[in-house]
From Swiss-Prot:
PANTHER family xref list: ALPHA-AMYLASE
GO biological process: carbohydrate metabolic process
Subunit structure: Monomer.
UniProt source species: Vigna mungo (Black gram)
Protein name, entry field: Alpha-amylase
Listed cofactors: Ca(2+)
Positions annotated as active site in the UniProt record: 201 (nucleophile), 226 (proton donor)
Enzyme superclass (EC): hydrolase
Residues holding substrate: 73-74, 199-204, 228, 230, 255, 289, 308, 314, 393, 420
Residues annotated to bind Ca(2+) 2: 130, 133, 135, 139
Signal peptide per UniProt: 1-23
EC number of the protein: 3.2.1.1
UniProt miscellaneous comment: Binds starch not only at the active site, but also via accessory binding sites on the protein surface that are important for efficient binding to starch granules and thereby increase enzyme activity.
Cofactor descriptive note: Binds 3 Ca(2+) ions per subunit.
């Protein structure tokens, strides 16, 4: 093989790796009610010292643009950051600068599958968009809406490349102008506002090849996509033991999107929140690996306990509230990139317990590709060794036999969990 061929293969290998180079620890810096509290950007500043002390490397901020819904998930004038219910454009820039001073990078919540229009067209349909600038950027019409979104489209756009969305017009992401102007906007969020990366909302709404385009054209420091599909359930209403199809779909999406993006590990969340309810046998797959995405492609998996949708006041798929720390004991000791939720850290009084776990992770160098050796996985007990450095126990069972070597000491513990190092 000549040197050019070797270089080409090396470059291809590098391009398929996630963009972040050092172990990341993500924090979701808002909940479903944050937009209603007034001045969220300014109030979040007060949290920065605690987040820095907990080893947070990236904070996920809410959608920054003008939106019909106060939470930001029905955006319209994408460049208009002064109309956000979370605060002004300058307040956002100041917040990001304050995070940067502590070495914490900021992710914007990118909501681009759909978009709300500014006014009606001649048919009386809301499908005339404005970008929020004095010029014509993102001033789109009905031809920029997916053809099969018949409630809004004029029938001249492309068919939707993903799943439909009923609450607002589905944008035609196969349109080169859409791709160009959305990429320009995201790059503006980086250069003008200071964002470092992205959390992509509802990535099922367009083909993964579209996500690849936006990744290539904006080159974020870190990016994660929300591909939320239901796990499979049995007739008893409980999750099926085998969720390989579910985690396989996440892996396929990541690879189809170019391999440089991560995905929220909804598989691990679904299994874990069932497992902590006396079914810890779920936490090992037939190959002896973790059963979620972290068991097959951990370097591209972002693990979490809850977010603004699953938890908060929406509670669409909440983790058992009395088992949350068992959940954090799992994700903060295991591979993947863990994400900590604002509510748990600040509102639930769990800051110290979570910070102890994150410090153990940091000082032992546990990262997204760490190895896991599962020592026990039964109804009331889960024990695993990570990187041959630390051991974690989850569950009420106290008799561990000889599972924990005598040279390890308890680094932290709580209700039905403990970590040794």
């Amino acid at each position: 093989m000549d040197s050019f061929s070797r270089l080409s293969i090396f470059c291809l290998f590098i391009s398929l790796l996630p963009l972040f180079s050092s172990p990341a620890l993500l924090f979701q810096g808002f909940n479903w009610e944050s937009s209603k509290k007034g001045g969220w950007y300014n109030s979040l500043k007060n949290s920065i010292p605690d987040l820095a002390n907990a080893g947070i490397t990236h904070v996920w901020l809410p959608p920054p643009s003008q939106s019909v819904s106060p939470e930001g998930y029905l955006p319209g004038r994408l460049y208009d950051l002064d109309a956000s219910k979370y605060g002004s454009k300058n307040e956002l820039k100041s917040l990001i600068a304050a995070f940067h001073e502590k070495g914490i990078k900021c992710l914007a919540d990118i909501v681009i599958n759909h978009r709300t229009a500014e006014r009606k067209d001649g048919r009386g349909i809301y499908c005339i968009f404005e970008g929020g600038t004095p010029d014509s950027r993102q001033d789109w019409g009905p031809s920029f809406i997916c053809r099969d979104d018949t409630a809004y489209s004029d029938g001249t756009g492309n068919n939707d490349s993903g799943e439909g969305y009923d609450a607002a017009p589905d944008i035609d992401h196969l349109n080169p102008q859409v791709q160009r102007e959305l990429s320009e906007w995201m790059n503006w969020l980086k250069t003008e506002i200071g964002f470092d990366g992205w959390r992509f909302d509802f990535v099922k709404g367009y083909a993964p090849s579209i996500s690849k385009i936006y990744m290539e054209q904006t080159k974020p420091d870190f990016a994660v996509g929300e591909k939320w599909d239901s796990i499979s359930y049995g007739q008893d209403g409980k999750p099926n033991y085998n969720q390989d199809s579910h985690r396989g779909a996440l892996v396929n999406w990541v690879e189809s999107a170019g391999g440089a993006i991560t995905a929220f590990d909804f598989t691990t969340k679904g299994i874990l929140q069932a497992a902590v309810q006396g079914e810890l046998w779920r936490l090992i797959d037939p190959n002896g690996k973790p059963p979620g995405m972290i068991g097959v492609k951990p370097e591209n998996a972002v693990t979490f306990i809850d977010n603004h949708d699953t938890g908060s006041t929406q509670r669409l798929w909440p983790f058992p509230s009395d088992k949350v720390m068992q959940g954090y004991a799992y994700i903060l000791t295991h591979p993947g990139t863990p994400s900590i939720f604002y509510d748990h850290f600040f509102d639930w009084g769990l800051k110290e317990q979570i910070a102890k776990l994150s410090s153990i992770r940091l000082r032992n160098g546990i990262n997204e590709k760490s190895t896991v050796k599962i020592m026990a996985s039964e109804g009331d007990l889960y024990v695993a060794k990570i990187d041959n450095k630390i051991m974690v126990k989850i569950g009420p069972k106290m008799d561990l036999g000889n599972l924990i070597p005598s040279n390890l000491h308890v680094a932290t513990s709580g209700q039905d969990y403990a970590v040794w190092e």
